[in-house]
Amino acid sequence: MSYYILCARLLALDLRQTAEKNNCFIFEAARNYHEKAFTTIKNFLADKQIWGADFNYAKYSSKMPDLLAGQTPNVFSNRFAGGALMDLGIYPLYASVRLFGKAQDATYQAQQLDNSIDLNGDGILFYPDFQVHIKAGKNITSNLPCEIYTTDGTLTLNTIEHIRSAIFTDHQGHQVQLPIQQAPHTMTEEVAAFAQMIQQPDQTLYQNWLDDASSVHELLYTMRQTAGIRFEAEK
């Protein structure tokens, strides 16, 4: 009997090696990475020169009242690898890697607790010819859209995950609405992608998933180091 591993966060190298050794798949549950919207967006941007992007995901945590009352919920604990970057910032990072590939370098500055865990922060991903600005937050809520800047105009997304709308506005003000069909549930397309991979294995695509996951976590590590975010397991 074969078993497949679904990892909600932190797809580690040793898990990847274990999966390969046992001839099974390991999937990281980064739901926006598998949205069909990103294929549509990437195809639309293919003939355009990118000048930069602003991606954000900040949502006030239901655990904030506990934190303010003096408790340390898991999402704000260095023992459980918590914080805004790890919990929500991973979605803008996956979007950037999905659309533009791995950045050359990254940095992150944050509002932090005494245990070094970030409540919110701003990061920059450095590509050869442009930068992607990242905002993540768990003690704030952002209602800002996400934008991708090109030489021809700006592509505006209503959000960075479970995308409903993508509208390109050129420098003359003319607009084009991309054919985005929002899935009925945030995890619908992710689950469908995993099921298809199991039923109809595609090793090339699977390796691309793993490589992109590795790129995301290398960037996360670099960003944490620049902000001084330290997890208990690393001490």
Give each language-model segment a name:
Residues 79-86, 176-185:
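A short glycine-threonine-serine/GTX helix/turn-capping micro-motif
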Residues 92-164, 191-201:
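Contiguous beta-strand/loop segments that form the cofactor/metal-binding neighborhood of enzyme cores
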Residues 181-192, 208:
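Active-site loop of classical SDR/Rossmann-like NAD(P)-dependent oxidoreductases
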Residues 12, 38, 92-93, 187-195, ...:
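A general structural signal for well-ordered alpha-helical segments in protein cores
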Residues 32-104:
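Predominantly a Rossmann-like dinucleotide-binding segment in NAD(P)-dependent oxidoreductases
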Residues 1-33:
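Beta-strand-loop-alpha-helix segment that lines the small-molecule cofactor/substrate pocket
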Residues 4, 30-33, 57, 112, ...:
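Structured beta->alpha junctions
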Residues 21, 193-235:
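C-terminal helix-rich "cap/oligomerization" subdomain common to oxidoreductases
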